[in-house]
């Protein structure tokens, strides 16, 4: 059953139109330089995500936001997302990498969905978030997280 779900998710990623891929890549290009702001928005929206990182447990988010450790970690997370976006519609290797690092840590589907919601909220405040952009990002996250969830 998981194979069928995964096959459907990969097919969905492959079904992203060139226009959708272009919209996702261009809007991401406008925000990828603000990795600290993106991670801050994610942690602010769901403190359980911040609590999943031992170096940030129990620390005041506003106090750590300006630190080098936070900036480095934000760069890793946003960089990984950038790799997914750059490789669209080919998400397979990124799915396996994310599952390999997040499944053993007990990251939940809810936390992934909260990451998605916080990232989208961040995007809405920083790009021209049209209906077409919304549909493109929705299809991208549906395909990527659908494939991740099938393996978790």
UniProtKB/Swiss-Prot annotation:
> SUPFAM superfamilies this protein is in?
Globin-like
Query: Which GO cellular component term is one of those annotated?
Result: hemoglobin complex
Encoded by which gene?
CTT-E
Task: Check the UniProt entry and state the signal peptide residues, or none.
Answer: 1-15
List positions binding heme b: 73, 102
**CDD domains cross-referenced by the UniProt entry:** Mb-like
Q: What is this protein called?
A: Globin CTT-E/E'
Q: Which GO terms describe its molecular function?
A: heme binding; metal ion binding; oxygen binding; oxygen carrier activity
Checking PROSITE patterns in the record gives: GLOBIN
Concerning InterPro entries, the annotation shows:
Erythrocruorin, Globin, Globin-like_sf, Globin/Proto, Mb-like_M
- Family affiliation: Belongs to the globin family.
Alphabetical list of Gene3D superfamilies matching this protein = Globins (1.10.490.10)
